[in-house]
């Protein structure tokens, strides 16, 4: 077995624990990482189900590159989204783009279709037949997944998600799309941190050799300060919409804290 199916036993166990159809979890694994547990996205999402560091921590995942921890963490997040929204399609949108629907860009909106294509490849007529392990039952009702012919796929149980013919795309998911659309405000800090690190390294690498050759430590300090200033200013202009959005969301909390402090004074 290759791709997501090499982790089928763990997928089945995690699906049983969180009352998920294992085909749904396998589809997410295939879409996010093609079954490679060392996959890392450009914005820091990690492992088989591409968990962001903050998300992994909140789910109790201490090593996102550990296949078992990652799959259980991703399954827990899918269960949380299914409980929140009540249908698979919206749960997948939130898995990819976060819970703020205003930030669901074009690639997030295409994400459920990619997952379903991979499910059909893995379990439909064009893919290998895999029988779930004993005791692993698909969820029922609106959350049930059904393997069907991809060429005329319409799934009422996925809020009418319709897909046309085409080859499955294994390059999508968080590792291939985050950073190319609006980033949920609560992920801005990680996104900016990654960009800041790359920009700082590029600036300092460009000037470090001649400065070190000159042996001028004072000049080296000035260069580092200038590099930091350039990075900060550049990042603000690059991410000003996201930063301003995050700041605006913090204003009400700040006002409330100020009012509380004033009342206690």
UniProtKB/Swiss-Prot annotation:
<dbReference type="InterPro" id="IPR000189">
    <property type="entry name" value="Transglyc_AS"/>
</dbReference>
<dbReference type="InterPro" id="IPR023346">
    <property type="entry name" value="Lysozyme-like_dom_sf"/>
</dbReference>
<keyword id="KW-1133">Transmembrane helix</keyword>
<dbReference type="GO" id="GO:0000270">
    <property type="term" value="P:peptidoglycan metabolic process"/>
</dbReference>
<keyword id="KW-1235">Degradation of host cell envelope components during virus entry</keyword>
<keyword id="KW-0812">Transmembrane</keyword>
<keyword id="KW-0456">Lyase</keyword>
<comment type="similarity">
    <text>Belongs to the transglycosylase Slt family.</text>
</comment>
<dbReference type="Pfam" id="PF01464">
    <property type="entry name" value="SLT"/>
</dbReference>
<keyword id="KW-0929">Antimicrobial</keyword>
<keyword id="KW-1236">Degradation of host peptidoglycans during virus entry</keyword>
<dbReference type="InterPro" id="IPR008258">
    <property type="entry name" value="Transglycosylase_SLT_dom_1"/>
</dbReference>
<dbReference type="GO" id="GO:0098932">
    <property type="term" value="P:symbiont entry into host cell via disruption of host cell wall peptidoglycan"/>
</dbReference>
<keyword id="KW-0081">Bacteriolytic enzyme</keyword>
<dbReference type="GO" id="GO:0008933">
    <property type="term" value="F:peptidoglycan lytic transglycosylase activity"/>
</dbReference>
<keyword id="KW-1160">Virus entry into host cell</keyword>
<dbReference type="GO" id="GO:0042742">
    <property type="term" value="P:defense response to bacterium"/>
</dbReference>
<feature type="region of interest" description="Slt-type domain">
    <location>
        <begin position="19"/>
        <end position="98"/>
    </location>
</feature>
<keyword id="KW-1231">Capsid inner membrane protein</keyword>
<protein>
    <recommendedName>
        <fullName>Transglycosylase</fullName>
        <ecNumber>4.2.2.n1</ecNumber>
    </recommendedName>
</protein>
<dbReference type="GO" id="GO:0055036">
    <property type="term" value="C:virion membrane"/>
</dbReference>
<feature type="transmembrane region" description="Helical">
    <location>
        <begin position="219"/>
        <end position="239"/>
    </location>
</feature>
<dbReference type="GO" id="GO:0039641">
    <property type="term" value="C:viral inner membrane"/>
</dbReference>
<dbReference type="GO" id="GO:0031640">
    <property type="term" value="P:killing of cells of another organism"/>
</dbReference>
<keyword id="KW-1162">Viral penetration into host cytoplasm</keyword>
<dbReference type="GO" id="GO:0003796">
    <property type="term" value="F:lysozyme activity"/>
</dbReference>
<dbReference type="GO" id="GO:0016020">
    <property type="term" value="C:membrane"/>
</dbReference>
<keyword id="KW-0472">Membrane</keyword>
<feature type="active site">
    <location>
        <position position="32"/>
    </location>
</feature>
<keyword id="KW-0946">Virion</keyword>
<dbReference type="GO" id="GO:0098994">
    <property type="term" value="P:symbiont entry into host cell via disruption of host cell envelope"/>
</dbReference>
<keyword id="KW-1171">Viral genome ejection through host cell envelope</keyword>
<comment type="subunit">
    <text>Heteromultimer composed of proteins P7 and P14.</text>
</comment>
């Amino acid at each position: 077995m290759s791709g997501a199916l090499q982790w089928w036993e763990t997928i089945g166990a995690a699906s049983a624990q969180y009352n998920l159809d294992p085909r749904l979890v396998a589809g997410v694994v295939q879409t996010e990482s093609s079954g490679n547990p060392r996959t890392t996205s450009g914005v820091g999402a990690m492992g088989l189900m591409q968990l962001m560091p903050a998300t992994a921590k909140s789910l109790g995942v201490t090593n996102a590159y550990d296949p078992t921890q990652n799959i259980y963490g991703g399954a827990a997040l899918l269960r949380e989204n299914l409980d929140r929204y009540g249908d698979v399609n919206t749960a997948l949108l939130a898995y990819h783009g976060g819970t703020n629907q205003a930030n669901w860009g074009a690639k997030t909106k295409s994400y459920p279709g990619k997952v379903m294509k991979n499910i059909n490849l893995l379990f439909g007529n064009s893919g290998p037949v895999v029988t779930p392990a004993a005791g692993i039952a698909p969820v029922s009702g609106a959350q049930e997944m059904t393997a069907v012919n991809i060429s005329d796929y319409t799934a009422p149980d996925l809020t009418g998600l319709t897909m046309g013919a085409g080859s499955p795309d294994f390059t999508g998911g968080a590792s291939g799309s985050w950073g190319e659309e609006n980033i949920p405000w609560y992920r801005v800090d990680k996104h900016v941190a990654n960009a800041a690190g790359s920009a700082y390294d590029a600036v300092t690498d460009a000037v470090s050799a001649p400065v070190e050759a000159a042996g001028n430590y004072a000049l080296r300090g000035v260069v580092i300060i200038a590099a930091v200033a350039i990075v900060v200013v550049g990042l603000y202009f690059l991410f000003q919409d996201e930063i301003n959005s995050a700041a605006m969301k913090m204003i009400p909390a700040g006002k409330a804290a100020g009012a509380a402090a004033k009342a206690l004074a």
